[in-house]
Amino acid sequence: LAASVAITVGAAKNSFTESMADAALSRKVGYGLDSGVQMGPVISKESKQRIEGIIGKSTQEGANVLVDGRNKPVSGYEDGYFIHPTILDNVNPNGDIAKTEIFGPVLSLMHASTVEEAIALVNNRAYGNMACIFTSSGAVARKFRNEADAGNVGINIGVAAPMAFFPFSGWN
C-alpha cells in the first residue's frame, strides 16, 4: 500500500511539501532488477495512459504539478511504462483525482486549517483503505481514530497496513 493523498494541517504545509518533493525527486526509477532501482514501471500501457490522463485532468481542476513524473524515459527502456513520482499540490477536494484510486506513483496534496477540516477531507472519499495521522497530541490522535472513516487507521506510521485476520474491503 502507498498513500495517494496527504493532507497537511496549518503550519505543516510548507515543510511537508518541501520534504515530499525532495523525496520524490531522489527516487531512482528503472527496471526493478537493476541495482539501486527503487521504483519500477506501472503494469501496462493502458495503466500509464490512465494515470497520465488523471494527472492532466487534475491540473484542469486546479491542481498544481509540484513534481512531474510524466514523459521521463528510462535509459534502455524507452518504451517502458514508467511514470516517475508525481506530486500534485492544492488538489481540488471535489476533483476526480481526490475521489479516484489512481494506482500509480502520484501523491495528491491537500491542505486544511484545522483537524476537523482534515477529517472531513478524509471522509469525502468513497474509498478508504487507510488513513494515517502524524501528531504529538493524544487528543488529536483519538479524535482522528474515532472520526476518520477508513478501513485501517494509523497513528504516527506512514502506512496502516491491513492484517490478514481483519476484514478489509477498501470502502469507507
Regions found by a protein language model. Name each.
Residues 1-5, 21-53, 68-82, 99-104, ...:
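Flexible, acidic loop-helix segments that line cofactor/substrate-binding pockets
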Residues 5-12, 87, 172:
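Short beta-strand and adjoining strand-loop segment in the mid-core
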Residues 7, 66-69, 133-134:
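Short beta-strand segments
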Residues 10-13, 47, 114, 138:
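Helix N-cap motif at beta-to-alpha junctions
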Residues 11-39, 53-71, 90-97, 147-156:
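Glycine/threonine-rich helix-loop capping motifs at alpha-helix boundaries
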Residues 28, 55, 78-172:
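Conserved C-terminal structural/oligomerization subdomain of aldehyde/semialdehyde dehydrogenase
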